[in-house]
Amino acid sequence: VNEFTEQSLKIMKESPINKKRNDAKKKSLSCILLRDAGNKYPDVKPINEMYSMKFSCIVDMPVELGISEVLEMKAFEAGGLTDYEEKARVAAKAMETQNAIYVHLKGPDEFGHDGDAIGKMKNIEEIDQRFFKTLLANIDSNKVAIVISADHSTPCINKGHSDDPVPILVSGNFIKNDGTTRMTEKQAKKGSIGLIQGADVVTTSLDLIKSQIQPNL
């Protein structure tokens, strides 16, 4: 890794692309960031075997693409990072043949790293209006549940990740209301799911859904 980093720094320093960027008064490309590298392939069962279900995904980022390959999840193409309506339509269509589909939306995290609280708020509102509104219009909420959460928190004040708990919402017409009215950290504390570990999110959500969905659906 160190040798790769040293060579990449030298190559980028002499790159004609950086010369053009410098001439245009733009910042140079100075480093290739390597993170979360491993030295062996994870020994994990395919997710369909773990849960006896058909899982699939819509993901854009390299880490999530890697996870989907390791877990042998079918990946659906659904436009670019901000093609929220397309992602919602593809997800809804996929539910005709799949039992569950994981959709990873990157947007709010970027605003957190930039320390842009207003931008983060507006992006979450945009996702709500464009992705979830489209998704709800294309699924039967009497038969399909939606689980919303985050893989980590990115407080704008930190401009980085933190270990603060993130809210989780399990919603569907057949899911009993536990008194919460909004998806916020404060409301999540009052919810019936309680505080759980990230590794338990899928199992906890599936158990809740299976316990409340009508047997004939």
Features from the language model and the residues they span:
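Feature captures the catalytic ectodomains and active-site-proximal regions of enzymes
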Residues: V1-L217
